[in-house]
């Protein structure tokens, strides 16, 4: 298990909620990830304004996982 010594803290806002994130990544990276997540959630919310926050988060996660797997396959040459 990693020690907490090299952990960094960042505060981010996603969909109006504030989250305190502890990560080994630099705070700027964590904020970039949160910004990307927020952007993707906003895009989905515009197309589906009646989704509750849980469904919005799950569907956004599915869309991002889909993007990731397609890019991974491209990178690996599949």
Curated annotation (Swiss-Prot):
- Coiled-coil ranges per UniProt: none
The record's disulfide annotation reads none
The positions making up the signal sequence are none
Q: Which UniProt keywords apply?
A: Cell cycle, Cell division, Cytoplasm, Septation
* Gene Ontology CC: cell division site; cell septum; cytosol
Q: Which InterPro entries match?
A: Bac_CellDiv_Activator, Cell_div_ZapA-like, Cell_div_ZapA-like_sf
Q: Name one GO biological process term.
A: FtsZ-dependent cytokinesis
Instruction: Fetch the Gene3D superfamilies from UniProt.
Output: 6.10.250.790
Q: Does the keyword Protein transport apply?
A: no
* Entry-linked SUPFAM superfamilies: Cell division protein ZapA-like
Under Pfam families, the record lists: ZapA (PF05164)
Question: NCBIfam families this protein is in?
Answer: PRK14126.1 (NF010724)
Q: What does this protein do?
A: Activator of cell division through the inhibition of FtsZ GTPase activity, therefore promoting FtsZ assembly into bundles of protofilaments necessary for the formation of the division Z ring. It is recruited early at mid-cell but it is not essential for cell division.
The UniProt similarity line reads: Belongs to the ZapA family. Type 2 subfamily.
- Subunit structure and binding partners: Homodimer. Interacts with FtsZ.
What is the protein name given in its UniProt record?
Cell division protein ZapA
- What's the source species for this entry? Shouchella clausii (strain KSM-K16) (Alkalihalobacillus clausii)
The gene designation is zapA
């Amino acid at each position: 298990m990693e020690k907490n010594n090299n952990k960094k803290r960042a505060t981010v806002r996603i969909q109006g909620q504030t989250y305190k994130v502890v990560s080994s990544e630099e705070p700027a990276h964590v904020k970039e990830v949160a910004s990307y997540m927020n952007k993707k959630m906003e895009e989905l919310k515009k197309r589906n304004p009646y989704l509750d926050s849980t469904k919005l988060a799950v569907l956004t996660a599915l869309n991002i996982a889909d993007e990731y797997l397609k890019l991974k396959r491209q990178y690996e040459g599949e």
